[in-house]
């Protein structure tokens, strides 16, 4: 490999011709310092009658640019600058890769071409011969052997089918047994669940009977409450016995003549009547009972007149 470079002047194109069996590689281009600021220079190359733009240089922004261009034949470099020169640099190298490729191709082709050809032919030939022999032997013998060979196969197939069906039947029976066992287990579980559900329901009627008993007992307490009012009348009777007189009933009858009769009929009364003669009985006489007898006689007379 050898370094290479060329300076291209304004308005002048520079031709470059690579040597035989060699290549020219352009890697970089740059401007001189004499170029004014703000001026841009366009770089171009002409190969085989075609002019191509390869880049643009500027003193302020892009004073140099990198390339990776390889040429194996004559080419021409130029630029659009008016005062500055453009320098192209790179290197030369021998064209060795082409020889390597050709030699490798030449070596690979003879080795690859003859090797697969005989193997393919022999394999195909052997296979073809085997196929022909296999075809000719059964053709020589008629189809008498085929039915004999097919019958045991069919019998074997029938037997295998029968075995498969019997196995399937056994599996189905097993499945039915398993299903029945599962159903029995489910029924037992359901019965147990029903028993468990029924057991907590038994105390409910007991609770329901309790309020009925309390309700039936309440009227009994009401009946017993009636004699409780009796003690209220006992002190009055004792006072009447002490006084020897009989008080009038709290609710007098509408007819005036019946009240004295009721007073005489009562066993506990002092034997008073509506008439004044009954008030003179000896067991009612006395100073202690005088006032009560007079009051009773007066009440009886008044009621009889009414």
Swiss-Prot record:
Short name of any one Pfam family annotated for the protein: NPL
Biased composition annotated in UniProt, kind: Acidic residues: 97-110, 152-198
Alphabetized UniProt keyword annotations: Acetylation, Chromatin regulator, Developmental protein, Hydrolase, Nucleus, Phosphoprotein, Repressor, Transcription, Transcription regulation
Region (Required to repress transcription): 2-5
Quaternary structure annotation from Swiss-Prot or TrEMBL: Interacts with DNMT2.
Species, as recorded: Arabidopsis thaliana (Mouse-ear cress)
Keyword Transferase recorded: no
Stated name of the protein: Histone deacetylase HDT2
Main location: nucleus
């Amino acid at each position: 490999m050898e370094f290479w470079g060329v300076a291209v002047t304004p308005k002048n194109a520079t031709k470059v011709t690579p040597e035989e069996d060699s290549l020219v590689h352009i890697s970089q281009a740059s401007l001189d310092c004499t170029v004014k600021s703000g001026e841009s220079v366009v770089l171009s190359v002409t190969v085989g009658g075609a002019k191509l733009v390869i880049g643009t240089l500027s003193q302020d922004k892009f004073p140099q640019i990198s390339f990776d261009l390889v040429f194996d034949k004559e080419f021409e470099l130029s630029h659009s600058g008016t005062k500055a020169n453009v320098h192209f640099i790179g290197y030369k190298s021998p064209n060795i890769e082409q020889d390597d490729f050709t030699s490798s191709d030449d070596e690979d082709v003879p080795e690859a071409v003859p090797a697969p050809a005989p193997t393919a032919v022999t394999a195909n030939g052997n296979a073809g011969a085997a196929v022909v022999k296999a075809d000719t032997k059964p053709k020589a013998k008629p189809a008498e052997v085929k039915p004999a060979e097919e019958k045991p196969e069919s019998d074997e197939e029938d037997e295998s089918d029968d075995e498969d069906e019997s196995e399937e039947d056994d599996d189905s029976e097993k499945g039915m047994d398993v299903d029945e066992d599962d159903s029995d287990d489910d029924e037992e579980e359901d019965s147990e669940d029903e028993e468990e559900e029924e057991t907590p329901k038994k105390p409910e009627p007991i609770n329901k009977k309790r309020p009925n008993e309390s309700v039936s007992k309440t009227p009994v307490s009401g009946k017993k409450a009636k004699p409780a009012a009796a003690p209220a009348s006992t002190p009055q009777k004792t006072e009447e016995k002490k006084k020897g007189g009989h008080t009038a009933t709290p609710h007098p009858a509408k007819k005036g003549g019946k009240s004295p009769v009721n007073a005489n009929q009562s066993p506990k009364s002092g034997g008073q009547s509506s008439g004044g003669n009954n008030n003179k009985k000896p067991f009612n006489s006395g100073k202690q009972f005088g006032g009560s007898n007079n009051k009773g006689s007066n009440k009886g007379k008044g009621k009889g007149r009414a």
